[in-house]
Regions:
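Hydrophobic alpha-helical transmembrane segments of multi-pass integral membrane proteins
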Residues: 1-172
């Protein structure tokens, strides 16, 4: 347990300074708090706080990890799909899709804040927010036109992003 907390602290100490202050847009600035939250939740997990608290921490970590995956997946897949489309003589208009990306980040951030609160109505709202983020992630994926892709490496990335969208729907 102590070694896990030490490792999480060391990773945060090494990685976080690179992200703080370097980004200009709020979507890019969200990476540092995401990584800090994951490090903190990792350090707290298994700390003997009780099964209910550890389960809540696990769900919170899952929300943060899904947020990071949605953010990073879009930053990797969008230019790769645009380059692939260009190599085939096509133009992919929907690339990073900052509106959808921002909406997913906001929805998952709100769900992260609302989920641990003790009121059932707020937990239901958090679940609805996660489902909405899953729907928006699926829309984002479809706008990349995965059916036009024949490259195995890109198909695997698209499949991973599809699982993320599906997982958010199930988590909600």
């Amino acid at each position: 347990l102590a070694s896990a907390a030490t490792f999480a602290g060391a990773v945060a100490w090494k990685v976080l300074p690179r992200f703080f202050g370097a980004a200009k847009k709020w979507r890019n600035q969200s990476v540092a708090p995401l990584l800090a939250g994951l490090a903190l939740l990792s350090a707290m997990a298994g700390s003997g706080l009780g099964v209910a608290v550890e389960r809540l921490l696990l769900v919170e970590a899952l929300l943060l990890f899904a947020t990071l995956m949605a953010f990073m997946g879009g930053r990797i897949i969008a230019p790769a799909m645009a380059g692939y489309a260009q190599s085939e003589g096509r133009r992919l208009d929907a690339r990073v899709q900052p509106g959808l990306e921002g909406a997913v980040l906001i929805l998952l951030g709100l769900a992260f804040v609302l989920n641990p609160l003790p009121w059932p109505l707020l937990r239901q709202l958090a679940a609805a927010l996660v489902i909405s983020a899953g729907v928006l992630s699926a829309i984002r994926l479809l706008r990349w036109q995965p059916w036009r892709c024949a490259r195995a490496d890109l198909l695997i990335l698209l499949l991973g992003y599809a699982w993320l969208a599906f997982g958010l729907l199930l988590l909600g």
